[in-house]
């Protein structure tokens, strides 16, 4: 019944202002005992995470900006159960992945991070991003800050739409917002904070961010190293960036052979567009 009311509310309110939620689904419930077992399996030191709450794990489909249109993407929403005080909204940005379903709302280790943080009393959100997860876009625009930031921001909007309307979600959101991420997620964390500050400060007030091990100076330190002639341990990241940016800015080049020599120009479409290979495999092919 509540789901029907949510859909009716959604249809009414779309005539007033744009909603971003398309649908959402409860994937799994984890008890405190389940989460403690997960901590043991992960080999985490005692006391790093102390679960206080069981959690419900949802997959959310929502709309986000991609180039000059809106597209449907997916993300995880993990909600603590039986909280007696308001919970902060905490957005986790995942690390680099090239496999379509190696993302938080599906079966990846990134999902476990969301579960652990939610068990300590956070509503944890984790965007899968354009081109990954449920997205039908054939390539993730890797490291494109505007696109990645909006995937995170729109998932926060979706959570604010869903949580007050679903009687099965017994948590109230506080005014606190935390952003954190690792690797690509560290960079996305910075982009998200910047976009919120510049464009959406009337809608969101970020309490704190924790960007970890991100690429923060692509046009400086990264470019200098690439041009230095030194061996690069993860060469697959370079075509991922170039091809991802070309998907946003098609004028960058017409053909991969304009940028890459053979056999790489012929190899990269299969490696990246198919979403079948992880970055370890792609790095080995480069």
Residue ranges and their predicted role:
Residues 19-85:
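Catalytic-loop region of hydrolases
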Residues 202-213:
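A conserved short beta-strand
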Residues 67-74, 78-120:
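Short, surface-exposed "cap/lid" segments of acyl-processing enzymes
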Residues 142-166:
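Alpha/beta-hydrolase active-site loop
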Residues 212-286:
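Accessory cap/linker subdomain of secreted extracellular hydrolases
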Residues 79-86, 158-180, 199-204:
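Gly/Ser-rich "nucleophile elbow"/oxyanion-hole loop immediately N-terminal to the catalytic nucleophile
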Residues 1-20:
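Bacterial Sec-dependent N-terminal signal peptides
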Residues 181-185, 189:
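Gly/Ala-rich beta-loop-alpha elbow adjacent to hydrolase catalytic centers
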